Amino acid sequence: MRYDAFISYSHAADGALAPAVQRGLQRLARRWHRPRALEVFRDQTGLAVSHALWSSIKVALDQSEFFVLLASPEAAASPWVNQEIEHWLSRHSVDRLLPVVTSGEWVWDADAGDVDLERSTAVPPALRGVFGEEPRHLDLRWARAEHELDLRHGRFRDAIAELAAGMHGMSKEDLDGEDVIRHRQMLRMRRGALAVVCALLLLVAGTAVAWRNARGEVTATNVALQRQRAATAAEQHRTEEAADQARSQQQIVEAEQQRAQKAAEEARGQQAVAEAEQQRALRAAGEARRQEGIAAAEQRRAQKAAAEARRQRGVADAEKAKANRAAAEAERQRKIAADEQRKAHEAAAEAERQREEAVKQQRIAIGRRLLGQAGEARDRDPRTAIQLGIAARHIYPGPQSQAGLVETLVRTHYAGTVTGHTAVVSAVALSGDGRTLVTDGLDGTVMVWDPTDRAAPRRLAQLTSSTAPVYTVALSGDGRTLVTGSEDGTAMVWDLTDRAAPRRLAQLTGHTDVVDAVALSGDGRTLATGSFDGTAMVWDVTDRAAPRRLAQLTDHTAPVTAVALSGDGRTLATGSDDHTAMVWDLTDRAAPRRLAQLTGHTAGVDAVALSGDGRTLATGSYDGTAMLWDLTDRAAPRRLAQLTGHTAQVYTVALSRDGRTLATGSEDHTAMVWDLTDRAAPRRLAQLTGHTDAVDAVALSGDGRTLATAASITRRCCGM
């Protein structure tokens, strides 16, 4: 048997909708003499009892012209539906696959040229990659109520017409017109049949009346004959004229009798016709009753299917409820296990914390004893005192041991002094490894020192290539590159690979006044300079012999007296006599971007320093204070603390690479060392009082263990 369409669907999702679609396709535009407009296969109506279910379905698929897919999440997950699609596509064109979405989502990915299976919950996996372009699908997600699943419902009838149009080989509008014509023909035929029946009934009644009239005429004729015979017998004696008249009258009567007989025969023929029409009417009525019986049977099947669908939904809901209960119980057990595991971890963590606390207290006690012994041995055996202080700091590297070690160092003769400049020493710099110290003076000289023996630093070289006073110096992290800034507005780049024989690589020009500040990034690729001309400049020194100026910063309104770069070179800080410091983004070094302006000092900002990670900024000012700033959000710096230990201008600040130690130098002839473990509450560790003049410069080695300070004439180097 050939089918016009095969319906593939999920019983759980569309047990009621699938029969309604089948009935609609079979009835829409049906001719009066045919039981169905289309032959539609659906598993519950098209299959007989068989031992080979899939084989029967395959036969139906092969004999079907169109494949109607009722797409839903349940159908997408059904192995039967996917198997039916795969078999259909192996033997038919995808053009004859008609998708009808009954629930879920059907989403087309225009970029991929395929159905979006991630967002399409109603699309079976078997349809991946089969469509050459976006298919037109019918949306029946609204059709759920019983009254919506009937051709008398306008929207449902319209949807069925759209689905059936292609199967009939005509447009939807033509199919609508055809259905209207068929409906009107059926009404006309019903009315005609009723009229014929009524006419037949009237004809039968008329024939019966005619037959009765004919019988009356025959009777009357017989009476007339009898009377005629009597008259003839009685009046035989009448004249020939009367006899002729009688014969003539007899002929007339015989003619009337013949007409009556013909009328009777015609009445009998009409009665036979009426009886035949009555039989046809009875057969038509029987066919009508049979059709009503078929309709009633279809309705009963539909009701049974709906009841079965409701039962299946009930079973599915019950299974879902059981699954939900099982999932809830599994989740409860998981939470119990997780809680027990958390308690076990907490107990283990508490035990570990108590053990660590015991070890910590033991280290603190040992460290305190060692610091006490160091204090006792400070005068009689300085070397032993320092060793004890170092041991105490190693055992417990806390603020107390750090302060004790610093105090021991500054109170012994192991703080070294270097001399040699004939004018004010304006700057000092230490390499990251603490092996190279550079000092500069207003006498125009720059000296290179080896501070390995901090008690007796050794001078390695003296740079005298400039006759102008040198105001500032900076060393790269590896100690191989030195930059100096001079009164004549120039900066110079030096190669210290051989520290005993420094070699000048380049001279930088561009400033129009004293270069008072220089700084190198951690990777040695970026140089920043600041000048009394009110500008700062950014240079590329990747090629040290041929530096390139990248940008000039002109936002300050007074001399730029301090610059500092973060370890990664992405952050620049500048300080100025305009009482402000500024933070710059150097991600694009050729186009620096100002992120923030820091205010708070009441006099010129003469010193800035950045920690290695760029999160901490220190500023020093002529107002006698130093300030700490949090640059975690560089666009919104936050002031952490104000350091007020000095009694005069703060000329210089230096931060260790880890940002935990700060050194400051002041006009009050002292340098101070601060513990920044808690940046919001800095703690002064030591005050260094060995200088007899203003401390113009301080420098910390990368590991924070060596501090160099410079006063107007002397330089000191001490261990930390």
Curated annotation (Swiss-Prot):
Reactions it catalyzes: NAD(+) + H2O = ADP-D-ribose + nicotinamide + H(+)
The TIR domain, residue ranges: 1-131
UniProt cross-references to SUPFAM superfamilies, sorted A to Z: Toll/Interleukin receptor TIR domain, WD40 repeat-like
Record membrane topology: Single-pass membrane protein
Localization (cell): Cell membrane
GO BP of this protein: NAD catabolic process; signal transduction
Span list, region Disordered: 231-275, 292-359
Transmembrane portions of the chain: 192-211
Coiled-coil positions: 313-362
Compositionally biased spans, kind Basic and acidic residues: 256-268, 307-359
One Pfam short name: WD40
Ranges occupied by WD repeats: 420-459, 465-504, 510-549, 555-594, 600-639, 645-684, 690-720
GO MF annotations in UniProt: NAD+ nucleosidase activity; NAD+ nucleosidase activity, cyclic ADP-ribose generating
Main localisation: membrane
SMART domains membership: TIR, WD40
Family matches, as InterPro entries: G-protein_beta_WD-40_rep, TIR_dom, Toll_tir_struct_dom_sf, WD40/YVTN_repeat-like_dom_sf, WD40_repeat_CS, WD40_repeat_dom_sf, WD40_rpt
Residues the entry annotates as binding NAD(+): 10-11, 48
Domain comment in the entry: The TIR domain mediates NAD(+) hydrolase (NADase) activity. Self-association of TIR domains is required for NADase activity.
Listed name of the protein: NAD(+) hydrolase ApTIR
Organism: Actinoplanes sp. (strain ATCC 31044 / CBS 674.73 / SE50/110)
